[in-house]
């Protein structure tokens, strides 16, 4: 699959997730089979660009793979400036967020709140596309609610404005993440536009991945929450798509190595104070299917230093293996 002049190594993409798809997580997913990883969203408000959080989101020097940076906001001029700033800091693709359902984003008329204002969407898309010389993509939902599904017209508008790929989550904003994603809307959008369409929502297994690709005709898949605590899901899906067989479960020794490497990378990236705190949620995701881990997770969440976290994980896996 290509986005503009960029050839992805496969059609599996890591979805942008605030507080999750930082550089350590993106690098890990790329190592375990993802074809591209989209960064956490960056606000178009220039007053926030110099904050520690935004600075961490802009670290791209030496990063593996294609560097896709997501921006969020509702002001066309500020969105254009955010796109330019991102490109100056290493972005090779700009992704526009019109899919985030979070209240704190929507109350600023950003994310999926924009689906109620097609005229504003058009202004934003044109402004961003005209502001940069890299491909611009769009991530969105099927509509504001079930009575106001407008993804088909938004997709056609996006293509007309020069958007070079469209990721569509199979839920409305009102659905948040409740219920099941639907794929009929994605199928209809794929039939209506000529730009690449990326299916998103509840793609949590190799079998589901193949079904969604075949049912919708989508060019690629975008995977978010199912990769939390299971970044190797991308290689599992790719293996199944290529060979029609499922990979054996990773041995516990490899899961241990992945976790320890990820936690160490978080410590190094965020530092001694913030690193251990961010590591807690990732460890919880890794261990969510370990029946014996509930007590350990509570203990781990109280640990405040990097060395103690690593020692605790070593001890946990020693007990699991014994």
Curated annotation (Swiss-Prot):
Its cofactor is FMN. PANTHER family: TRNA-DIHYDROURIDINE(47) SYNTHASE [NAD(P)(+)]-LIKE. The active site is at 100 (proton donor). Belongs to the Dus family. DusB subfamily. CDD domains: DUS_like_FMN. FMN binds at residues 16-18, 70, 139, 200-202, 224-225. Catalyzes the synthesis of 5,6-dihydrouridine (D), a modified base found in the D-loop of most tRNAs, via the reduction of the C5-C6 double bond in target uridines. The keyword Transport does not apply. The keyword Flavoprotein applies. It catalyses: a 5,6-dihydrouridine in tRNA + NAD(+) = a uridine in tRNA + NADH + H(+); a 5,6-dihydrouridine in tRNA + NADP(+) = a uridine in tRNA + NADPH + H(+). It is an enzyme of class 1 (oxidoreductase). InterPro entries: Aldolase_TIM (IPR013785), DUS-like_FMN-bd (IPR035587), DUS_fam (IPR001269), DusB (IPR032887), DusB-like (IPR004652), tRNA-dHydroUridine_Synthase_C (IPR024036), tRNA_hU_synthase_CS (IPR018517). It comes from Vibrio cholerae serotype O1 (strain ATCC 39315 / El Tor Inaba N16961). This is tRNA-dihydrouridine synthase B. Keywords: Flavoprotein, FMN, NADP, Oxidoreductase, RNA-binding, tRNA processing, tRNA-binding. NCBIfam families: nifR3_yhdG. GO terms for molecular function: flavin adenine dinucleotide binding; FMN binding; tRNA binding; tRNA dihydrouridine synthase activity. Its EC number is 1.3.1.-.
